[in-house]
Amino acid sequence: MRPTPLSTILALTMAATAPAMAASLKDVAPYPEAEKGFTRQVIHLPAQADEQAYKLEILAGKTLQVDCNRQRLAGSLEEHTLEGWGYNYYRLDKVGGPASTLMACPDGKKTEAFVPVVGEGFLLRYNSKLPVVVYVPDGVQVRYRVWSASQDVQKAKVE
């Protein structure tokens, strides 16, 4: 029996440990196409050593002309299950607003800014093994932020 070259072993090891983000969505599962008036947006997360210490925040929103007030849109991100597979995907059906604070803006200047949708369901479990699939109405952008837990744990006081 011939010894296996080190380069072959290294190549096989790298292929086996490649992140799921290398695969296209169709290679993972038959997620439905976006319905008319919606887009399907996908997030591929890198693997982390301790994924339980991380959360994924979905920031769906629109780029709008805003003044000095704080702007926000309203909506709820709902979790659905891909039948026969058990994989989750998320859907934002309606986006309301915008709503704004009512501060006086003396200069009256407007700038373009990303205005997020605020509501329930936007903080998700971190899972690099599967893509995060989000269906949103046309014109809505999906951005995301990864949160991590601090290693510094505090003790509560008994009072």
Curated annotation (Swiss-Prot):
Subunit structure as annotated in this protein's UniProt entry: Homodimer.
Pfam families in the cross-refs: Ecotin
Lineage: superkingdom: Bacteria
Recorded name of the encoding gene: eco
Locations listed in the record: Periplasm
Similarity-based family: Belongs to the protease inhibitor I11 (ecotin) family.
Residues annotated as signal peptide: 1-22
SS bonds (residue pairs): C68-C105
GO MF terms, alphabetically ordered: serine-type endopeptidase inhibitor activity
NCBIfam families: PRK03719.1
Site (Reactive bond): L102, M103
Protein name as catalogued: Ecotin
One cellular component term from this protein's GO annotations in UniProt: periplasmic space
General function of this protein: General inhibitor of family S1 serine proteases.
PANTHER family: ECOTIN (PTHR35890:SF3), PTHR35890
